[in-house]
Regions:
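ATP-dependent carboxylate-amine ligase catalytic core
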Residues: 1-46, 53, 67-74, 78, ...
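Active-site phosphate/pyrophosphate- and oxyanion-stabilizing loops and adjacent acidic/basic residues
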Residues: 49-50, 102
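A contiguous pocket-lining binding segment that forms or flanks enzyme active sites
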Residues: 58-63
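Glycine-rich anion-binding loop/nest that anchors nucleotide
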Residues: 64, 68, 92
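C-terminal lobe/tail of nucleotide-utilizing enzymes
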Residues: 77-145
Length: 145
């Protein structure tokens, strides 16, 4: 998308910008959403996986709870492990699929299922968070919620 818009992503500028935003947000956590997936290139020679390996942030992996999620999510977890990165949690978004959740739960410290929130706004997110121990789990609490 950046190339199509005539933009160049400089990993050094990204690093400096993130550092400034983390400092501004402190002590609150800063959420950074990656675009697309782990192997999406930021430059022709630098992927989002490379960026994560360099920055070493706390990672919460979000995946669709649908057909194909086992392969896609397990491949992503394998790619993270190859870089010595371990997600704090996995959030499966969509209709619950007990078999998928059970299979993936064995590979992550914490697993949560999130229904489609409509409308997707602050009130819907706050309502879901009020009923789920995700923040505690990501910081080091319960196993699965």
């Amino acid at each position: 998308a950046a190339a199509a818009a005539g933009k160049v992503i400089d990993p050094e500028v990204l690093h400096d910008s993130l550092g400034a935003r983390v400092a501004e947000a402190a002590p609150a956590p800063l959420v950074v959403e990656l675009a697309g997936g782990l192997q999406v290139p930021l430059t022709p020679a630098f992927t989002q996986a490379d960026w994560l390996a360099r920055e070493r942030p706390r990672i919460v992996l979000v995946a669709r709870s649908a057909l194909g999620t086992l392969n896609h999510t397990l491949l992503t977890l394998e790619a993270l492990r190859a870089r010595r990165l371990t997600p704090s949690a996995l959030i499966l978004v969509g209709d619950p699929h007990a078999e998928n959740a059970a299979t993936l739960a064995a590979h992550v410290p914490h697993l949560f299922e999130l229904p489609i929130l409509a409308p997707l706004d602050r009130a819907a997110i706050d309502g879901w968070l009020a009923d789920h121990p995700i923040a505690e789990a990501i910081r080091g609490g319960t196993k699965h919620g």
